[in-house]
Curated annotation (Swiss-Prot):
Membrane topology label: Single-pass membrane protein
Record's keyword terms, sorted: Cell membrane, Membrane, Stress response, Transmembrane, Transmembrane helix
Full protein name: Starvation responsive small protein A
Gene: srsA
Inducers of expression: By starvation. Rapidly and transiently expressed in the first 5 minutes following the removal of nutrients. Expression declines after 30 minutes and is undetectable 2 hr after nutrient removal.
Disruption phenotype: Cells show no aggregation after 11.5 hr of starvation under submerged conditions in contrast to the wild-type. Cells developed on agar exhibit 2 hr delay in aggregation and the aggregation streams formed after 9 hr are larger than normal leading to over-sized mounds. No significant difference in the time of conversion of mounds to migrating slugs, but the larger slugs formed by the mutant cells often subdivide before forming normal-sized fruiting bodies with an apparently normal proportion of spores and stalk.
Subcellular location: Cell membrane
Length: 106
């Protein structure tokens, strides 16, 4: 009887079953995470749905910002990392090389 059930399932059915399983597992994970956060046992970031992302972008577009302005602002925020100049790297390299040569002579 079980063999007949497996034979009657088509590849499309397998794909649907796998997708349904993945989606339900994701939903269980989100519910579990929210319950743990409510209990205070886990201090994780609360789940934010994908709809929130689009609402935020839509609100920015309504305010008069176009998509290129939004992307430029994101890039500016990411560029705040401190960079070391090439000359500073050369100085550090020369100093380390001198120290190594002094240690090697001793």
């Amino acid at each position: 009887m079980i063999a007949k059930v497996f034979k009657s399932i088509t590849p499309e059915s397998y794909i649907l079953l796998v997708n349904a399983g993945l989606i339900s597992a994701y939903g269980v994970r989100i519910i579990f995470q929210s319950v743990k956060n409510d209990e205070g046992k886990v201090d994780e970031k609360a789940h934010i749905g994908i709809g929130h992302f689009f609402k935020k972008r839509g609100a920015q577009l309504v305010d008069g910002k176009n998509l290129t302005d939004i992307l430029k602002e994101k890039k500016k925020k990411k560029k705040k990392k401190k960079k070391i100049n090439i000359s500073n790297k050369l100085i550090i390299f020369k100093i380390s090389r001198q120290l190594y040569s002094k240690l090697k002579l001793k």
